[in-house]
Every structure is written in structure tokens, then in C-alpha cells.
Amino acid sequence: MSSPPKEKTETRAGHLPAVKAGGMRIVQKHQSAIEVPDKKDDKDSTEYETVIPPKLPVVVSGVVTKGDKDFTPAAAQVAHQKPVPSAQKLPAGQHLNQHIHQPRK
């Protein structure tokens, strides 16, 4: 690619126009001239920090819960496990020996 021109080119909408090369448009990125000032640690910035409010008690069915005392992590884990079947399935070998005889056309 050729080097960018030394003189200032006309900008549209605040940026340089795209260059067409090989049938595709290529956007030329330019460096912004705006410098962001560094944030300084002042006493004023610490005054406006928010404090996390204490957790409010949760009411379940009219009773105030006590956090992990009412619902332990182990009890919650059991509630999310897959249920164990009460009856066992038959072995798959019995189903393979059955043949269905159908007449041909």
C-alpha cells in the first residue's frame, strides 16, 4: 500500500474516507488526537462510593428463613440430583430374540 498523503485530506463525518483496493473497501484507522486525562485518587472520589446494603431476610411461606441454617448446601444438592428409579428395567437381551414375520409383496 502507498503511504498516506502528507497534506491534510478532507474528512467526512469526522473520519477519512475508505480506500478501495482489489474490489474491497479498506478502512484506514487514524489515531485520535483527544487525550484522556488520568484519573486521580482524591478524597472526594472515596466519599461517593456506595456501601453494599445488608441482606434483607427472606420470607418463605410466611416464615423468615435463616440462610444456610434452613437450607444447607447438601440438602440443595440432593434436591437437584436425578431421581433413582424404583423398578429396574429388563435386560436388553430378551428383546433381540423376538422376530416379527411379515409376508413379502
Curated annotation (Swiss-Prot):
A Pfam family that the UniProt record links to this protein: DAP
Highest taxon in the source lineage: Eukaryota
Span list, region Disordered: 75-105
GO molecular function, one term: ribosome binding
InterPro entries, per database record: DAP1/DAPL1
Biased composition range(s): Polar residues: 95-105
Heme recorded as keyword: no
Subunit structure: Associates with ribosomes; inhibiting translation. Interacts with eiF5a (eif5a and eif5a2); inhibiting translation.
General function of this protein: Ribosome-binding protein involved in ribosome hibernation, a process during which ribosomes are stabilized in an inactive state and preserved from proteasomal degradation. Acts via its association with eiF5a (eif5a and eif5a2) at the polypeptide exit tunnel of the ribosome, preventing mRNA translation. Involved in ribosome hibernation in the mature egg by preventing mRNA translation, leading to ribosome inactivation. Ribosomes, which are produced in large quantities during oogenesis, are stored and translationally repressed in the egg and early embryo.
Family in the record: Belongs to the DAP-DAPL1 family.
Protein name: Death-associated protein 1 homolog
Record organism: Danio rerio
